[in-house]
Amino acid sequence: MAASGFWIGVESMPRSVLRAALQHERPIFCGRLPADNVLQTQLGNMSERAEWHEVALGTPIGQGYLLDLLRQRLPVDRVVLSLAVSASGYDGTHKTSPLDRLLPQARDVVEALLVVSRGAEAVMDPGTDASMTIMLGDCGESATPLNEGLAAFVTRFAQAESKRWAEMGLSLSVEHEHSGE
C-alpha cells in the first residue's frame, strides 16, 4: 500500500506547497477548510487525488480526530505542519490584543506542535526516512514579542527533538516561510 503524506494546517500554507504536495502518492490535507471549497478549486483537477479533512487542532475532538486519521492511514512517510505563530499580536497601530485572545492563540500553537509531533512519531516506522516538517509563517515587521517567542520555542523544540528522531531514523525539521504568496 502507498504511504500517506499529511499536510496539516492547510489554511495557512502557501498554495505552492499544496500544489507540490499533490505530487505525493497519497496526499491528505487537514485543517480548517473553507465551506466554499476554494482551496480545492485553486489547486485544480489534481486536488481530486487528495483526501480533505476538516480538522480543528485547537479542540480535543479535532486533535483526537487527527490522531485517529494518522493511525487509519498507515503507513505514513510525510507530515507537514503549518503553524500560524503570527496570528497573535497587535491590533492596528501598536495596540495590544486582549489577553483572552492571546492565550488561546499561543496555546493552539503549542498544543498543535506537541499533538502532531507525538502523533507523527507514533505512526512513522523507524529507519524508513519518514519525515516531519514544521512550517512557520513569516512574522514580518509587525512581529510582536509573543510571535517571536513562539517561533523561537517551535524552532528550539524541533532542534532538540530532531536529535532523538534521527536516532530512530526519522527526520524532524523547521522551515521558515517568507511572505510571497
Segments and roles (model prediction):
Residues M1-N37:
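Canonical Rossmann dinucleotide-binding motif of NAD(H)/NADP(H)-dependent dehydrogenases/reductases
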Residues G9, S16, V85-M168, E175-H178:
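Catalytic loop of short-chain dehydrogenase/reductase
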Residues A20-L22, L43, E161, W165:
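Hydrophobic alpha-helical packing residues
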Residues T41-H53, M168-L172:
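A short helix-to-beta-strand connector/capping loop
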Residues E51-R107:
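Conserved mid-core segment of classical short-chain dehydrogenase/reductases
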